[in-house]
Amino acid sequence: MAMDSKKEIRLKRELGYFWGTNFLIINIIGAGIFVSPKGVLQHSSMNVGVSLCVWAVCAVLTLTSALCSAEIGITFPYSGAHYYFLKRCFGPLVAFLRLWTSLFLGPGLIASQALLLAEYGVQPFYPSCSAPILPRKCLALAMLWIVGILNSRGVKELSWLQTVSSVLKVGILGVISLSGLFLLVRGKKENVQRLQNAFDAEFPEVSQLIEAIFQGYFAFSGGGCFTCIAGELKKPSKTIPRCIFTGLPLVTVVYLLANISYLTVLTPQEMLSSDAVALTWTDRVIPQFTWTVPFAISASLFINLVINVLETSRVLYIASENGQLPLLFCALNVHSSPFIAVLLIISMASILIVLTNLIDLINYLYFVVSIWTALSIIGILKLRYQEPNLHRPYKVFLPFTFIALGITLSLVLIPLVKSPKLHYIYVFLFLLSGLVFYVPLIHFKVKFVWFQKLTCYLQLLFNICIPDVSDDHIHEES
Protein backbone atom coordinates (compact mmCIF):
# COMPACT_ATOMS: atom_id res chain seq x y z
CA MET A 1 0.00 0.00 0.00
CA ALA A 2 1.06 3.55 -0.61
CA MET A 3 2.73 5.04 2.45
CA ASP A 4 4.43 8.43 2.54
CA SER A 5 6.31 10.07 5.42
CA LYS A 6 3.04 10.36 7.35
CA LYS A 7 2.32 6.65 6.72
CA GLU A 8 -0.91 7.41 4.87
CA ILE A 9 -2.65 4.56 3.09
CA ARG A 10 -4.45 5.50 -0.11
CA LEU A 11 -4.50 5.05 -3.88
CA LYS A 12 -1.21 6.18 -5.38
CA ARG A 13 -0.84 9.07 -7.81
CA GLU A 14 1.72 7.39 -10.05
CA LEU A 15 0.19 7.45 -13.54
CA GLY A 16 1.51 10.01 -15.99
CA TYR A 17 0.94 11.39 -19.47
CA PHE A 18 2.02 8.30 -21.43
CA TRP A 19 -0.15 5.95 -19.36
CA GLY A 20 -3.12 8.33 -19.57
CA THR A 21 -2.87 8.67 -23.35
CA ASN A 22 -2.74 4.89 -23.73
CA PHE A 23 -5.69 4.58 -21.37
CA LEU A 24 -7.78 6.95 -23.51
CA ILE A 25 -6.83 5.24 -26.78
CA ILE A 26 -7.70 1.73 -25.64
CA ASN A 27 -10.95 2.99 -24.09
CA ILE A 28 -12.11 4.49 -27.38
CA ILE A 29 -10.77 2.00 -29.93
CA GLY A 30 -12.82 -1.13 -29.46
CA ALA A 31 -13.46 -4.18 -31.62
CA GLY A 32 -16.10 -2.29 -33.61
CA ILE A 33 -13.65 -0.58 -35.99
CA PHE A 34 -12.41 -4.07 -37.03
CA VAL A 35 -15.84 -5.72 -37.22
CA SER A 36 -18.57 -3.29 -38.22
CA PRO A 37 -17.58 0.31 -39.05
CA LYS A 38 -20.47 0.23 -41.51
CA GLY A 39 -23.25 1.81 -39.46
CA VAL A 40 -22.14 5.32 -40.42
CA LEU A 41 -21.90 4.38 -44.12
CA GLN A 42 -25.30 2.68 -44.10
CA HIS A 43 -27.11 5.65 -42.56
CA SER A 44 -25.24 8.05 -44.86
CA SER A 45 -27.09 6.43 -47.81
CA MET A 46 -23.75 4.88 -48.87
CA ASN A 47 -22.47 8.36 -49.68
CA VAL A 48 -18.73 7.97 -49.11
CA GLY A 49 -18.00 11.68 -48.69
CA VAL A 50 -20.83 12.23 -46.22
CA SER A 51 -19.80 9.20 -44.15
CA LEU A 52 -16.22 10.49 -43.81
CA CYS A 53 -17.53 13.93 -42.82
CA VAL A 54 -19.75 12.28 -40.20
CA TRP A 55 -16.70 10.57 -38.66
CA ALA A 56 -14.98 13.95 -38.38
CA VAL A 57 -18.09 15.57 -36.84
CA CYS A 58 -18.36 12.74 -34.31
CA ALA A 59 -14.75 13.34 -33.28
CA VAL A 60 -15.57 17.01 -32.54
CA LEU A 61 -18.70 16.03 -30.58
CA THR A 62 -16.67 13.51 -28.59
CA LEU A 63 -14.11 16.21 -27.83
CA THR A 64 -16.82 18.42 -26.28
CA SER A 65 -18.01 15.57 -24.02
CA ALA A 66 -14.44 14.60 -23.10
CA LEU A 67 -13.62 18.19 -22.11
CA CYS A 68 -16.74 18.35 -19.93
CA SER A 69 -15.57 15.19 -18.17
CA ALA A 70 -12.09 16.72 -17.93
CA GLU A 71 -13.46 19.68 -15.95
CA ILE A 72 -15.11 17.27 -13.51
CA GLY A 73 -11.98 15.12 -13.12
CA ILE A 74 -9.68 18.13 -12.70
CA THR A 75 -11.93 20.10 -10.31
CA PHE A 76 -12.56 16.98 -8.18
CA PRO A 77 -9.47 14.81 -8.80
CA TYR A 78 -10.70 11.60 -7.17
CA SER A 79 -11.00 8.10 -8.58
CA GLY A 80 -14.70 7.73 -9.43
CA ALA A 81 -15.04 11.53 -9.70
CA HIS A 82 -18.29 11.34 -11.70
CA TYR A 83 -20.01 9.66 -8.73
CA TYR A 84 -18.64 12.25 -6.29
CA PHE A 85 -19.64 15.07 -8.65
CA LEU A 86 -23.28 13.89 -8.83
CA LYS A 87 -23.38 13.69 -5.03
CA ARG A 88 -21.93 17.20 -4.75
CA CYS A 89 -24.40 18.67 -7.27
CA PHE A 90 -27.63 16.75 -6.69
CA GLY A 91 -27.31 15.15 -3.27
CA PRO A 92 -26.85 11.62 -1.91
CA LEU A 93 -30.02 10.11 -3.44
CA VAL A 94 -29.00 10.77 -7.06
CA ALA A 95 -25.46 9.56 -6.30
CA PHE A 96 -26.81 6.37 -4.74
CA LEU A 97 -29.03 5.65 -7.76
CA ARG A 98 -25.95 6.15 -9.95
CA LEU A 99 -24.12 3.66 -7.74
CA TRP A 100 -27.11 1.28 -7.83
CA THR A 101 -26.94 1.31 -11.64
CA SER A 102 -23.17 0.69 -11.67
CA LEU A 103 -23.52 -2.28 -9.31
CA PHE A 104 -25.43 -4.17 -12.03
CA LEU A 105 -24.49 -2.48 -15.30
CA GLY A 106 -20.75 -2.86 -14.68
CA PRO A 107 -20.81 -6.65 -14.10
CA GLY A 108 -23.39 -7.02 -16.92
CA LEU A 109 -21.09 -5.32 -19.42
CA ILE A 110 -18.10 -7.30 -18.15
CA ALA A 111 -19.99 -10.61 -18.45
CA SER A 112 -21.06 -9.75 -22.02
CA GLN A 113 -17.48 -8.94 -23.03
CA ALA A 114 -16.13 -12.11 -21.41
CA LEU A 115 -18.64 -14.27 -23.31
CA LEU A 116 -17.84 -12.51 -26.59
CA LEU A 117 -14.11 -12.96 -25.98
CA ALA A 118 -14.70 -16.66 -25.24
CA GLU A 119 -16.69 -17.02 -28.46
CA TYR A 120 -13.75 -15.71 -30.51
CA GLY A 121 -11.46 -18.10 -28.63
CA VAL A 122 -13.60 -21.24 -29.00
CA GLN A 123 -15.17 -20.78 -32.45
CA PRO A 124 -12.04 -21.74 -34.49
CA PHE A 125 -12.36 -25.26 -33.02
CA TYR A 126 -15.89 -25.55 -34.44
CA PRO A 127 -15.50 -24.33 -38.06
CA SER A 128 -18.72 -25.86 -39.39
CA CYS A 129 -21.13 -24.97 -36.57
CA SER A 130 -21.68 -22.72 -33.57
CA ALA A 131 -19.55 -23.46 -30.52
CA PRO A 132 -21.37 -25.20 -27.63
CA ILE A 133 -22.37 -22.95 -24.76
CA LEU A 134 -20.50 -24.92 -22.03
CA PRO A 135 -16.94 -24.41 -23.39
CA ARG A 136 -17.73 -20.75 -24.03
CA LYS A 137 -18.92 -20.22 -20.46
CA CYS A 138 -15.93 -22.09 -18.99
CA LEU A 139 -13.46 -20.03 -21.03
CA ALA A 140 -15.33 -16.81 -20.19
CA LEU A 141 -15.12 -17.61 -16.47
CA ALA A 142 -11.41 -18.44 -16.75
CA MET A 143 -10.65 -15.18 -18.58
CA LEU A 144 -12.78 -13.23 -16.11
CA TRP A 145 -10.87 -14.46 -13.08
CA ILE A 146 -7.53 -13.82 -14.82
CA VAL A 147 -8.72 -10.24 -15.33
CA GLY A 148 -9.67 -10.10 -11.64
CA ILE A 149 -6.18 -11.24 -10.62
CA LEU A 150 -4.57 -8.65 -12.90
CA ASN A 151 -6.72 -5.87 -11.41
CA SER A 152 -5.92 -6.95 -7.87
CA ARG A 153 -2.23 -6.41 -8.68
CA GLY A 154 -2.79 -2.65 -8.96
CA VAL A 155 -2.91 -0.13 -11.78
CA LYS A 156 0.86 0.04 -12.23
CA GLU A 157 1.00 -3.68 -13.00
CA LEU A 158 -1.48 -3.15 -15.85
CA SER A 159 0.77 -0.64 -17.62
CA TRP A 160 2.65 -3.19 -19.72
CA LEU A 161 -0.57 -4.90 -20.80
CA GLN A 162 -2.13 -1.57 -21.66
CA THR A 163 0.91 -0.49 -23.69
CA VAL A 164 1.01 -3.78 -25.62
CA SER A 165 -2.72 -3.55 -26.39
CA SER A 166 -2.46 0.06 -27.52
CA VAL A 167 0.51 -0.69 -29.79
CA LEU A 168 -1.30 -3.75 -31.18
CA LYS A 169 -4.54 -1.91 -31.96
CA VAL A 170 -2.92 1.19 -33.46
CA GLY A 171 -0.30 -0.95 -35.23
CA ILE A 172 -2.83 -3.15 -37.04
CA LEU A 173 -5.02 -0.16 -37.90
CA GLY A 174 -1.86 1.64 -39.04
CA VAL A 175 -1.00 -1.21 -41.42
CA ILE A 176 -4.56 -1.14 -42.78
CA SER A 177 -4.43 2.65 -43.18
CA LEU A 178 -1.00 2.86 -44.84
CA SER A 179 -1.76 -0.08 -47.14
CA GLY A 180 -4.98 1.63 -48.14
CA LEU A 181 -3.18 4.88 -48.92
CA PHE A 182 -0.62 2.99 -51.01
CA LEU A 183 -3.39 1.24 -52.93
CA LEU A 184 -5.17 4.56 -53.36
CA VAL A 185 -2.11 6.15 -54.93
CA ARG A 186 -1.16 3.17 -57.09
CA GLY A 187 -4.44 1.31 -57.19
CA LYS A 188 -7.09 0.59 -59.76
CA LYS A 189 -8.92 3.38 -61.50
CA GLU A 190 -12.33 2.46 -60.06
CA ASN A 191 -10.95 2.56 -56.50
CA VAL A 192 -9.57 6.06 -57.00
CA GLN A 193 -12.80 7.23 -58.65
CA ARG A 194 -14.81 5.99 -55.67
CA LEU A 195 -13.13 8.60 -53.48
CA GLN A 196 -12.75 11.26 -56.18
CA ASN A 197 -16.52 11.13 -56.69
CA ALA A 198 -17.19 10.69 -52.98
CA PHE A 199 -20.22 13.02 -52.88
CA ASP A 200 -21.86 11.80 -56.12
CA ALA A 201 -24.21 9.37 -54.39
CA GLU A 202 -27.60 10.42 -53.06
CA PHE A 203 -27.46 12.61 -49.95
CA PRO A 204 -29.12 11.14 -46.85
CA GLU A 205 -32.21 12.64 -45.25
CA VAL A 206 -31.82 14.58 -42.02
CA SER A 207 -33.18 11.69 -39.91
CA GLN A 208 -30.67 9.30 -41.50
CA LEU A 209 -27.85 11.77 -40.98
CA ILE A 210 -28.69 12.05 -37.28
CA GLU A 211 -28.68 8.26 -36.99
CA ALA A 212 -25.29 8.15 -38.75
CA ILE A 213 -23.92 10.66 -36.23
CA PHE A 214 -25.20 8.52 -33.35
CA GLN A 215 -23.51 5.45 -34.87
CA GLY A 216 -20.21 7.30 -35.14
CA TYR A 217 -20.57 8.86 -31.70
CA PHE A 218 -20.90 5.41 -30.12
CA ALA A 219 -17.67 4.36 -31.89
CA PHE A 220 -15.89 7.21 -30.06
CA SER A 221 -17.44 6.43 -26.65
CA GLY A 222 -14.96 6.28 -23.80
CA GLY A 223 -13.62 9.82 -24.02
CA GLY A 224 -14.80 10.60 -20.48
CA CYS A 225 -12.84 7.78 -18.88
CA PHE A 226 -10.51 10.03 -16.87
CA THR A 227 -13.17 10.72 -14.24
CA CYS A 228 -12.77 7.09 -13.16
CA ILE A 229 -9.03 7.26 -12.45
CA ALA A 230 -8.39 10.97 -11.78
CA GLY A 231 -7.28 10.12 -8.24
CA GLU A 232 -4.41 8.00 -9.57
CA LEU A 233 -3.03 10.49 -12.13
CA LYS A 234 -0.03 12.69 -11.49
CA LYS A 235 -0.91 16.39 -11.80
CA PRO A 236 -4.40 15.73 -13.25
CA SER A 237 -4.93 19.41 -14.11
CA LYS A 238 -2.14 19.11 -16.69
CA THR A 239 -2.20 15.42 -17.53
CA ILE A 240 -5.89 15.06 -18.45
CA PRO A 241 -6.08 17.87 -21.08
CA ARG A 242 -2.75 16.79 -22.60
CA CYS A 243 -3.93 13.19 -22.89
CA ILE A 244 -7.23 14.24 -24.49
CA PHE A 245 -5.59 16.55 -27.03
CA THR A 246 -3.08 13.83 -27.92
CA GLY A 247 -5.18 10.67 -27.85
CA LEU A 248 -8.42 11.89 -29.43
CA PRO A 249 -6.85 13.43 -32.59
CA LEU A 250 -4.77 10.26 -32.99
CA VAL A 251 -7.89 8.06 -32.78
CA THR A 252 -9.71 10.35 -35.23
CA VAL A 253 -6.91 10.15 -37.80
CA VAL A 254 -6.71 6.36 -37.41
CA TYR A 255 -10.51 6.00 -37.80
CA LEU A 256 -10.61 8.20 -40.91
CA LEU A 257 -7.62 6.52 -42.57
CA ALA A 258 -8.97 3.04 -41.76
CA ASN A 259 -12.34 3.88 -43.34
CA ILE A 260 -10.62 5.39 -46.40
CA SER A 261 -8.57 2.19 -46.68
CA TYR A 262 -11.67 0.00 -46.41
CA LEU A 263 -13.42 2.05 -49.12
CA THR A 264 -10.35 1.93 -51.36
CA VAL A 265 -10.46 -1.87 -51.47
CA LEU A 266 -14.17 -2.61 -50.91
CA THR A 267 -17.25 -1.11 -52.48
CA PRO A 268 -19.87 0.37 -50.11
CA GLN A 269 -22.11 -2.61 -50.89
CA GLU A 270 -19.33 -5.05 -49.95
CA MET A 271 -18.71 -3.20 -46.69
CA LEU A 272 -22.38 -3.40 -45.73
CA SER A 273 -22.60 -7.12 -46.53
CA SER A 274 -19.41 -8.05 -44.63
CA ASP A 275 -19.70 -9.50 -41.12
CA ALA A 276 -16.13 -8.43 -40.32
CA VAL A 277 -14.92 -5.62 -42.57
CA ALA A 278 -11.27 -5.75 -41.48
CA LEU A 279 -11.20 -9.52 -42.08
CA THR A 280 -12.63 -9.09 -45.60
CA TRP A 281 -10.12 -6.30 -46.30
CA THR A 282 -7.16 -8.36 -45.07
CA ASP A 283 -8.28 -11.45 -46.98
CA ARG A 284 -8.26 -9.39 -50.18
CA VAL A 285 -5.09 -7.33 -49.65
CA ILE A 286 -2.77 -9.36 -47.35
CA PRO A 287 -4.27 -12.88 -47.18
CA GLN A 288 -1.18 -14.21 -45.34
CA PHE A 289 -2.08 -12.02 -42.33
CA THR A 290 -5.80 -12.76 -42.11
CA TRP A 291 -5.20 -14.35 -38.70
CA THR A 292 -4.13 -10.99 -37.22
CA VAL A 293 -7.66 -9.55 -37.30
CA PRO A 294 -9.32 -12.12 -34.97
CA PHE A 295 -6.23 -11.77 -32.76
CA ALA A 296 -6.63 -7.96 -32.68
CA ILE A 297 -10.34 -8.30 -31.88
CA SER A 298 -9.62 -10.72 -29.03
CA ALA A 299 -6.88 -8.45 -27.65
CA SER A 300 -9.26 -5.47 -27.82
CA LEU A 301 -11.96 -7.34 -25.94
CA PHE A 302 -9.50 -8.59 -23.30
CA ILE A 303 -7.99 -5.19 -22.49
CA ASN A 304 -11.45 -3.57 -22.50
CA LEU A 305 -12.50 -6.23 -20.01
CA VAL A 306 -9.55 -5.29 -17.79
CA ILE A 307 -10.33 -1.56 -18.04
CA ASN A 308 -14.06 -2.02 -17.30
CA VAL A 309 -13.27 -3.94 -14.11
CA LEU A 310 -10.83 -1.16 -13.15
CA GLU A 311 -13.36 1.63 -13.77
CA THR A 312 -16.28 -0.10 -12.01
CA SER A 313 -14.14 -0.89 -8.96
CA ARG A 314 -13.24 2.81 -8.62
CA VAL A 315 -16.93 3.75 -8.44
CA LEU A 316 -17.42 1.27 -5.59
CA TYR A 317 -14.24 2.59 -3.96
CA ILE A 318 -15.34 6.23 -3.81
CA ALA A 319 -18.91 5.27 -2.86
CA SER A 320 -17.46 3.40 0.10
CA GLU A 321 -15.29 6.40 1.03
CA ASN A 322 -18.42 8.58 0.95
CA GLY A 323 -20.42 6.26 3.20
CA GLN A 324 -22.83 4.76 0.64
CA LEU A 325 -21.18 1.34 0.70
CA PRO A 326 -19.51 -0.47 3.61
CA LEU A 327 -15.91 0.60 4.31
CA LEU A 328 -14.82 -2.86 3.23
CA PHE A 329 -15.19 -1.84 -0.44
CA CYS A 330 -12.54 0.87 -0.21
CA ALA A 331 -10.05 -1.34 1.62
CA LEU A 332 -6.74 -1.57 -0.26
CA ASN A 333 -4.40 -4.53 -0.56
CA VAL A 334 -0.59 -4.36 -0.67
CA HIS A 335 -0.77 -3.36 -4.36
CA SER A 336 -3.03 -0.35 -3.64
CA SER A 337 -6.00 -2.04 -5.30
CA PRO A 338 -9.55 -2.07 -3.81
CA PHE A 339 -9.51 -5.86 -3.60
CA ILE A 340 -13.02 -6.48 -2.21
CA ALA A 341 -14.57 -4.18 -4.83
CA VAL A 342 -12.79 -6.11 -7.59
CA LEU A 343 -13.81 -9.43 -6.00
CA LEU A 344 -17.48 -8.38 -5.86
CA ILE A 345 -17.49 -7.28 -9.52
CA ILE A 346 -15.85 -10.51 -10.73
CA SER A 347 -18.21 -12.63 -8.60
CA MET A 348 -21.33 -10.86 -9.89
CA ALA A 349 -20.11 -11.10 -13.50
CA SER A 350 -19.44 -14.83 -12.98
CA ILE A 351 -23.02 -15.37 -11.80
CA LEU A 352 -24.30 -13.49 -14.86
CA ILE A 353 -22.18 -15.65 -17.18
CA VAL A 354 -23.77 -18.77 -15.69
CA LEU A 355 -27.25 -17.18 -15.93
CA THR A 356 -26.74 -15.78 -19.45
CA ASN A 357 -30.37 -14.77 -19.96
CA LEU A 358 -29.99 -11.99 -17.36
CA ILE A 359 -27.27 -10.20 -19.33
CA ASP A 360 -29.62 -8.95 -22.06
CA LEU A 361 -31.90 -7.40 -19.45
CA ILE A 362 -29.02 -5.71 -17.66
CA ASN A 363 -27.64 -4.33 -20.93
CA TYR A 364 -30.80 -2.22 -21.25
CA LEU A 365 -29.30 -0.17 -18.42
CA TYR A 366 -27.03 1.43 -21.05
CA PHE A 367 -29.99 3.73 -21.58
CA VAL A 368 -29.52 5.07 -18.04
CA VAL A 369 -25.83 5.88 -18.65
CA SER A 370 -26.86 8.71 -20.98
CA ILE A 371 -29.11 10.08 -18.22
CA TRP A 372 -26.18 10.18 -15.76
CA THR A 373 -23.97 11.82 -18.39
CA ALA A 374 -26.63 14.47 -19.03
CA LEU A 375 -26.97 15.10 -15.29
CA SER A 376 -23.19 15.50 -14.99
CA ILE A 377 -23.18 18.15 -17.72
CA ILE A 378 -26.14 19.92 -16.10
CA GLY A 379 -24.15 19.75 -12.85
CA ILE A 380 -21.28 21.65 -14.49
CA LEU A 381 -23.69 24.47 -15.39
CA LYS A 382 -25.29 24.31 -11.93
CA LEU A 383 -21.97 24.70 -10.11
CA ARG A 384 -20.86 27.47 -12.48
CA TYR A 385 -23.92 29.42 -11.30
CA GLN A 386 -24.05 28.40 -7.62
CA GLU A 387 -20.31 28.32 -6.89
CA PRO A 388 -18.62 30.75 -9.30
CA ASN A 389 -15.59 31.06 -6.99
CA LEU A 390 -14.95 27.30 -6.79
CA HIS A 391 -11.32 26.59 -7.69
CA ARG A 392 -11.34 25.21 -11.24
CA PRO A 393 -7.86 24.64 -12.71
CA TYR A 394 -9.61 23.93 -16.02
CA LYS A 395 -12.95 25.28 -17.30
CA VAL A 396 -14.54 23.86 -20.44
CA PHE A 397 -15.61 26.42 -23.06
CA LEU A 398 -19.30 27.04 -22.25
CA PRO A 399 -20.69 26.41 -25.80
CA PHE A 400 -19.02 22.98 -25.68
CA THR A 401 -21.08 22.22 -22.60
CA PHE A 402 -24.35 22.95 -24.42
CA ILE A 403 -23.26 20.90 -27.46
CA ALA A 404 -22.41 17.92 -25.23
CA LEU A 405 -25.70 18.31 -23.35
CA GLY A 406 -27.66 18.40 -26.61
CA ILE A 407 -26.14 15.21 -27.98
CA THR A 408 -26.52 13.42 -24.63
CA LEU A 409 -30.19 14.39 -24.24
CA SER A 410 -30.77 13.20 -27.81
CA LEU A 411 -29.34 9.81 -26.87
CA VAL A 412 -31.92 9.66 -24.07
CA LEU A 413 -35.00 10.98 -25.89
CA ILE A 414 -34.69 9.64 -29.44
CA PRO A 415 -34.76 5.91 -28.47
CA LEU A 416 -37.86 6.59 -26.34
CA VAL A 417 -39.65 8.36 -29.20
CA LYS A 418 -38.39 6.26 -32.11
CA SER A 419 -38.81 2.77 -30.64
CA PRO A 420 -40.59 2.81 -27.28
CA LYS A 421 -40.26 -0.55 -25.57
CA LEU A 422 -41.55 -2.05 -22.36
CA HIS A 423 -37.95 -2.65 -21.31
CA TYR A 424 -37.48 1.06 -20.67
CA ILE A 425 -40.26 0.92 -18.06
CA TYR A 426 -38.45 -2.01 -16.42
CA VAL A 427 -35.27 0.08 -16.37
CA PHE A 428 -36.99 2.94 -14.55
CA LEU A 429 -38.61 0.51 -12.11
CA PHE A 430 -35.20 -1.02 -11.44
CA LEU A 431 -33.77 2.45 -10.88
CA LEU A 432 -36.51 3.26 -8.36
CA SER A 433 -35.97 -0.08 -6.61
CA GLY A 434 -32.73 1.41 -5.30
CA LEU A 435 -34.89 3.40 -2.88
CA VAL A 436 -35.64 0.14 -1.02
CA PHE A 437 -31.98 0.09 0.06
CA TYR A 438 -31.35 3.84 0.17
CA VAL A 439 -34.04 4.70 2.73
CA PRO A 440 -33.00 2.32 5.55
CA LEU A 441 -29.26 2.04 4.89
CA ILE A 442 -28.32 5.58 3.83
CA HIS A 443 -31.11 7.90 4.97
CA PHE A 444 -31.75 6.26 8.37
CA LYS A 445 -28.19 4.85 8.60
CA VAL A 446 -29.17 1.39 9.81
CA LYS A 447 -26.02 -0.53 10.84
CA PHE A 448 -25.42 -4.27 11.19
CA VAL A 449 -23.11 -5.31 14.03
CA TRP A 450 -22.29 -8.63 12.35
CA PHE A 451 -20.97 -6.80 9.28
CA GLN A 452 -18.35 -5.01 11.39
CA LYS A 453 -17.09 -8.39 12.59
CA LEU A 454 -17.10 -9.64 8.98
CA THR A 455 -15.07 -6.58 7.92
CA CYS A 456 -12.39 -7.32 10.53
CA TYR A 457 -12.27 -10.99 9.53
CA LEU A 458 -11.92 -10.21 5.80
CA GLN A 459 -9.24 -7.60 6.48
CA LEU A 460 -7.16 -10.26 8.21
CA LEU A 461 -7.97 -12.92 5.60
CA PHE A 462 -7.04 -10.84 2.53
CA ASN A 463 -4.43 -8.57 4.16
CA ILE A 464 -6.29 -5.38 3.28
CA CYS A 465 -6.55 -2.05 5.09
CA ILE A 466 -9.01 0.86 5.17
CA PRO A 467 -7.35 3.90 3.49
CA ASP A 468 -6.73 7.21 5.22
CA VAL A 469 -8.59 10.34 4.13
CA SER A 470 -6.43 11.97 1.45
CA ASP A 471 -5.29 15.56 1.50
CA ASP A 472 -7.62 16.26 -1.43
CA HIS A 473 -10.65 15.17 0.59
CA ILE A 474 -9.54 17.09 3.68
CA HIS A 475 -9.16 20.25 1.57
CA GLU A 476 -12.57 19.69 -0.03
CA GLU A 477 -14.34 19.17 3.30
CA SER A 478 -12.75 22.24 4.85
From Swiss-Prot:
The keyword Transport applies. The keyword Disulfide bond applies. Expressed in renal tubules in the outer stripe of the outer medulla and medullary ray (at protein level). Detected in male but not in female kidney. It is found in: Apical cell membrane. Residues 36-47, 111-129, 185-208, 264-288, 360, 417-423 are extracellular. Gene3D superfamilies: Amino acid/polyamine transporter I (1.20.1740.10). It is a multi-pass membrane protein. Disulfide bonds: none annotated. Keywords: Amino-acid transport, Antiport, Cell membrane, Disulfide bond, Membrane, Transmembrane, Transmembrane helix, Transport. Belongs to the amino acid-polyamine-organocation (APC) superfamily. This is Solute carrier family 7 member 13. The lineage of its organism: Eukaryota, Metazoa, Chordata, Craniata, Vertebrata. The gene is Slc7a13.
